A protein has these predicted regions:
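Beta-strand-rich recognition/accessory modules
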Residues: 24-27, 130-133, 137, 163, ...
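Bacterial Sec-dependent N-terminal signal peptides
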Residues: 1-22
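Glycan-recognition and catalytic cores of secretory/periplasmic carbohydrate-active enzymes
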Residues: 304-315, 319-321, 329-769, 775-779, ...
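Beta-strand-rich interaction surfaces with strong enrichment in secreted/lumenal proteins
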Residues: 100-102, 223-227, 298-300, 310-311, ...
């Protein structure tokens, strides 16, 4: 309490606190309105173009900031009462007192929080801290465009930072110069099935800063904030920072809190490539180690005051930890040198047989065939390809009426049929069997006849399902295969036109929706419906020969894709996670684990990967290609580079008290039909702590419907974007760089060597005229060339 009073007196004396209004803390750039109950009513940042008001929950259970304690899995919230001084409040729960002071700190709105254990024994909660009260509840269009999604929260040993972002790309950063144990979010409940067991919902009710948290925590987190001894107190200052552009995040936070930060534009590299990253700090010491703890030589060059460039060659496949020490502060990052794309696809194909593909109500449970057929197309291996084809045919026959060529079960789940269409096309391209393409074509006709509305939308009864596992993209994939046969067979020409027109109508409906999309399950600003809408519009744009139409669709796609940034890990300095999208309700269905947790990357992160790839081809903006390759590097790490085994997803949350089913359903085998989402609590379960880690697959032992094979979307995405494609870019400063290739040359002559044998397509994005040699062939390309120069990649 003495500390708080001295701090308050100092701030008043310095003129940082206004004396006029009891409920408003402000300076020239912002106003912070505090209610009589100690909660935030609103936080307004003033800008030249207008004001940005940060929404907070009002008169709800999620009002904040609110002190809370979780013990034995149950939350208790404290109620603030005035503490006798302006802008200060206090509360107590079971002998633990918390005091909060709202004030100006380094020109930013800030809270200083002190927690005191007045009890007679140590205080060791599950967690204790603040529910911030920022409105994160995205439940309806168009309201969700103004809500803040917790995009990045990062605990370091000595400090904390992160940011929330809206779909309109307004960014609110959080920063503390003090170590914070952990963070968490509260998710809504979804539905009971069966009673009394709950599945989790699709919305976020609260972002929590957990100042004290039980162990274990990830190694990067503080390891000494798991208790308060009797009589002990700890204090934290937490500031809110208005970030105008995300590129300015690290610089702005360093300026406010004087913490060292690592800024990485690229997180994924090939072995032997030189990695670069910027370090923001005063006198940083930088160390890079491999996963065995061996140091790798780093060179550090000063670029400007407080900015340094680090360079390091990553010698072999693996993960590399970068550590920056600046004074008494320490930050960490992870770089990845990824395995070859060929090895990645070959291991994914092996996983298709190890982790059973099963005939269920959900296409996710047989998604592995995508990886297997793509690998079989480029790297045929009869010893496994024949077994894969046999397994696919077995499941297809279980799930379909072979005579009428339609699904036997759950026909309204049209994503099952569109996924099967895509797999049949890939199987046809791998094996050349016309019967597979014919099945795909007939299934597309059935889907269109039964589930396409007059306005073009593909639907499940009354809900638009076009962007539930990209139904239109699967039909366009079929169209492209049919078009190759159309010149010799009018039947295929007719089918290609029919299917293209259908998919185009569905995508046009998405464009006209202007972001008012629908999806499966509970409505929210949902990662998949946004990225799948963007990717399908982008794919259609690439198929347009008319430049006006191409631009029309490209502009629509880019608007949607930019809104998706708030759901994507675009700034996290971690190559395992970069480019992953923030899904959080899949664990209960995929690996039978509760409660919700952020899975990133998850299989559905691949949907954004297609979209950024298409965005690059449409615009030539290297930023989209960087995002694509960073994501592909993260995706490839779902295959453990040490042993080739497949993992399901990476969990981002630092600390989740989880429960997971640990026994198979003895009534079924992997060859049985099984329908619906099994409730994990109906089986033997095991309690476990999950935090910043990969989670294993379960389909090798779980016999009923489990959807962990959706991870294979990542390898399908790799197969369509980077497996066979290289890219050369001339940057504005004249530097020529390659992705998936090495570029050499002199003057206006370039020689390009692919990183892998199967890379046979080269896209060039050049400002000046060049003569380019690739794969033993040469071409002269004119000024401003931005297109495929050798080969022609699909979409």
């Amino acid at each position: 309490m003495i500390y708080m009073k001295k701090l308050l007196q100092a701030l008043l004396f310095a003129g940082f606190l206004p004396l006029s209004a009891q409920t408003v803390v402000k300076n020239s750039n912002w106003e912070w309105h505090i209610t009589q109950d100690g909660y935030t009513d609103k936080l307004i940042f003033k800008e030249k173009g207008g004001s940005d008001t940060i929404p907070f929950f009002k008169n709800q259970k999620n009002d904040g900031p609110c002190f809370y304690i979780r013990m034995d899995g149950q939350d208790t919230r404290g109620k603030w009462i005035p503490d006798g001084e302006q802008y200060t409040f206090r509360t107590a729960i079971d002998g633990v007192e918390c005091r909060i002071l709202y004030h100006v700190w380094n020109h930013q709105p800030a809270m200083t929080v002190t927690m005191i254990n007045n009890g007679n024994v140590p205080f060791q909660p599950d967690r204790a801290g603040l529910k911030l009260g920022i409105d994160t509840y995205m439940d309806k269009y168009p309201d969700w465009f103004g809500k803040y999604f917790p995009t990045l929260m990062r605990n370091e040993k000595t400090h904390f930072y992160g940011y929330l972002q809206t779909p309109k790309e307004h960014t609110l950063a959080l920063v503390s110069p003090h170590p914070i144990a952990s963070w968490s979010v509260d998710y809504n409940l979804g539905y009971m099935d069966p009673k009394p067991f709950w599945f989790m919902g699709h919305r976020i009710e609260s972002l929590n800063l957990d100042l004290i948290n039980a162990l274990p925590l990830p190694e990067r987190n503080p390891q000494n904030l798991w208790q308060l001894k009797q009589g002990e107190s700890k204090t934290w200052t937490i500031a809110f920072v208005n970030i105008r552009t995300l590129d300015n995040l690290e610089t702005a936070l360093n300026k406010v809190a004087r913490i060292p930060l690592i800024q990485m534009e690229q997180t994924a590299y090939r072995p032997g490539e030189e990695a670069q990253f910027e370090v923001i700090g005063e006198k940083p010491i930088v160390k890079v180690t491999d996963d065995k703890g061996n140091q790798v030589l780093v060179t550090l060059t000063k670029k400007a005051v407080g900015r340094y460039l680090a360079k390091v060659v990553l010698p072999t496949v693996g993960l590399y930890q970068a550590t920056v020490i600046d004074g008494d502060k320490e930050s960490e990052a992870v770089l990845t040198a990824h395995a070859t794309w060929r090895w990645t696809l070959e291991q994914a194909r092996k996983a298709t047989m190890k982790y059973h593909q099963k005939a269920t109500s959900h296409a996710e449970s047989w998604y592995g065939f995508y990886s297997a057929f793509i690998a079989g197309r480029y790297f045929p291996d009869s010893s496994i390809d024949e077994a894969v084809a046999k397994r696919f045919d077995f499941l297809y026959d279980l799930l379909h009426d072979k005579k009428e060529v339609k699904p036997l079960y759950y026909g309204s789940r049209i994503q099952n049929t569109s996924t099967t269409i895509g797999m049949l096309v890939d199987k046809y391209e791998a094996e050349g069997k016309m019967e597979d393409l014919e099945k795909a074509s007939l299934l597309a006709d059935w889907l269109i006849d039964h589930w396409q509305r007059e306005d073009g939308a593909y639907v499940n009864r009354h809900t638009v399902y076009t962007s539930v596992i990209y139904v239109a993209k699967s039909i366009l994939e079929l169209t492209l295969a049919e078009q190759k046969l159309a010149e010799k067979d009018s039947r295929w020409k007719s089918a290609a036109e029919r299917h293209y027109n259908s998919a185009k109508c569905a995508i046009d409906q998405l464009v006209h929706s202007r972001g008012d999309f629908q999806t499966e399950g509970e409505m929210t600003f949902e990662d998949g419906m946004i990225s799948c809408s963007a990717l399908q519009i982008g794919m259609l744009a690439l198929m347009q020969k008319d430049e006006t139409l191409r631009k029309y669709y490209a502009d629509a796609m880019l608007e949607i894709l930019k809104s998706h940034s708030c759901l994507t890990q675009l700034r996290v300095p971690d190559g395992r996670r970069r480019g992953g999208t923030m899904r959080y309700w899949e664990a209960q269905y995929d690996v039978e684990m509760l409660p919700n947790m952020f899975n990133s990357p998850h299989g559905w992160s691949g949907w954004r990967g297609y979209a950024t790839y298409y965005a690059y081809l449409l615009t030539g903006d290297e930023e989209w290609l960087k995002q694509t390759f960073n994501a592909m590097g993260a995706f490839s790490n779902l295959i453990d580079y040490k042993n080739g085994d497949l993992r399901w997803a990476f969990v981002v949350d630092p600390y989740v008290q989880a429960v997971q089913a640990c026994s198979h359903d003895t009534r079924f085998t992997a060859d049985s039909l099984s329908f619906g989402n099994p409730q994990p609590r109906l089986y033997d379960t095991r309690k476990l702590i999950i935090g910043e880690q990969y989670v294993n697959m379960i389909s090798d032992w779980q016999t009923i419907n489990s959807q962990d094979n959706d991870v294979h979307e990542l390898f399908k995405c790799i197969g369509e974007t980077v497996l066979t494609n290289a890219f050369v870019i001339e940057r504005p400063n004249g530097e020529v760089v390659g992705y998936n290739c090495r570029v050499s040359g002199k003057g206006n002559t370039l020689t390009v060597k692919a990183d892998e044998k199967q890379i046979v397509n080269l896209h060039c994005n050049l400002k000046q005229p060049f003569s380019v040699t690739f794969g033993g062939k040469s071409r002269s390309l004119p000024k401003g060339y931005c297109d495929w120069a050798f080969g022609q990649s699909g979409y």
